Amino acid sequence: MIIVYTTFPDWESAEKVVKTLLKERLIACANLREHRAFYWWEGKIEEDKEVGAILKTREDLWEELKERIKELHPYDVPAIIRIDVDDVNEDYLKWLIEETKK
């Protein structure tokens, strides 16, 4: 299992991408949360509202998921960050495997 973290400029784009990834069975679930982001862009520090997405999936779907997020994402340079999960309860992992691409 892996967790993929990415951010979106608003709820609408986050929900659209997440629902597409769910329908395509590239992820088993997602958690969305609004937050403030501070970052460098074109030589200056910017501040914006963003929606962070925690996506849960299988390790073998990483490359396909990463490419699909790039295709769907509204940002020019989206953060698509993989976090390897070393341990997870067996029932959750079984559910995740059953709910993602066969």
UniProtKB/Swiss-Prot annotation:
Summarize where Cu cation binds, as residue positions.
Answer: 48
What are the boundaries of the signal sequence?
Answer: none
- Statement: the UniProt record of this protein carries the keyword Metal-binding: yes
Q: Name one GO biological process term.
A: response to metal ion
Q: Which family does it belong to?
A: Belongs to the CutA family.
Q: Which NCBIfam families match?
A: dival_cat_tol_CutA
> What is the recorded name of this protein?
Divalent-cation tolerance protein CutA
Recorded source organism is Pyrococcus horikoshii (strain ATCC 700860 / DSM 12428 / JCM 9974 / NBRC 100139 / OT-3)
Per the UniProt record, the lineage of the source organism begins with: Archaea, Methanobacteriati, Methanobacteriota, Thermococci, Thermococcales
